């Protein structure tokens, strides 16, 4: 069954309800410029109450490997989601948590870059989002379907792919059936305002996403 990641959480209530509704992963954004930013200390207060079957994911932009490790330890993060193109392959080997590598995909994107990254780092779990200058997730912009097909085709046989960008409770089931991702990621698509989840939309999103079977599991 497809994995569901609810991202950009900043309140205990939203996190607990996401777990009750069936989310598999919860995302906490440590990028200070994001409207969904949460401090490591506040994230830790939420994460320590999560059930053991729900993974915590830290979203990072512009952080060095050592700082990522420190934040993950402080906030009790299971998985580091890395959006930073400046980290080299060697930097990824220094990271202690499990890793999801984010790729912002546009028309000029060379899908072979994903395989090269996997071969250099061993990281085999990815999140694909639509490219938007200076924005890292939560944009509400959908990834072109043809491009999405290409990236998911590229990782067949070695990778697990999450789809993000422009998903909501109305389009997620159709998207999952069409692209068959390992998982889906949503932030702005189920919000009443940045960082505040609309509970009815969140419940419906998770239910609709999980109607379709998908790849069995990495995380």
Swiss-Prot record:
GO terms for biological process: L-tryptophan biosynthetic process. Pfam families: PRAI. GO terms for molecular function: phosphoribosylanthranilate isomerase activity. It comes from the Bacteria. InterPro entries: Aldolase_TIM, PRAI_dom, RibuloseP-bd_barrel, TrpF_fam. Pathway: Amino-acid biosynthesis; L-tryptophan biosynthesis; L-tryptophan from chorismate: step 3/5. CDD domains: PRAI (cd00405). It is an enzyme of class 5 (isomerase). The keyword Manganese does not apply. Its EC number is 5.3.1.24. Keywords: Amino-acid biosynthesis, Aromatic amino acid biosynthesis, Isomerase, Tryptophan biosynthesis. It catalyses: N-(5-phospho-beta-D-ribosyl)anthranilate = 1-(2-carboxyphenylamino)-1-deoxy-D-ribulose 5-phosphate. HAMAP family: PRAI. Belongs to the TrpF family. This is N-(5'-phosphoribosyl)anthranilate isomerase. It comes from Chloroherpeton thalassium (strain ATCC 35110 / GB-78). The lineage of its organism: Bacteria, Pseudomonadati, Chlorobiota, Chlorobiia, Chlorobiales. The gene is trpF.
């Amino acid at each position: 069954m497809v994995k569901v990641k609810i991202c950009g959480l900043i309140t205990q209530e939203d996190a607990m309800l996401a777990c009750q509704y069936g989310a598999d992963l919860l995302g906490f954004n440590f990028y200070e410029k994001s409207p969904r930013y949460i401090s490591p200390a506040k994230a830790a207060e939420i994460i320590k109450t999560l059930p053991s079957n729900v993974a915590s994911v830290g979203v990072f932009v512009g952080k060095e490997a050592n700082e990522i490790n420190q934040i993950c330890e402080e906030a009790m993060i299971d998985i580091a989601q890395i959006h930073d193109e400046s980290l080299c392959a060697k930097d990824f080997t220094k990271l202690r948590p499990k890793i999801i590598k984010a790729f912002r995909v546009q028309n000029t994107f060379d899908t072979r870059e994903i395989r090269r990254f996997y071969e250099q780092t061993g990281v085999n779990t990815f999140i694909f989002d639509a490219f938007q200058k200076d924005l890292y997730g939560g944009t509400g912009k959908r990834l072109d379907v043809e491009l999405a097909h290409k990236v998911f085709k590229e990782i067949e046989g070695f990778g697990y792919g999450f789809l993000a960008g422009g998903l909501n409770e109305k389009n997620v089931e159709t998207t999952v059936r069409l692209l068959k991702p390992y998982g889906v990621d949503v932030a702005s698509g189920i919000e009443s305002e940045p960082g505040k989840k609309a509970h009815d939309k969140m419940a419906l999103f998770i239910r609709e996403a999980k109607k379709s079977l998908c790849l069995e599991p990495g995380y």
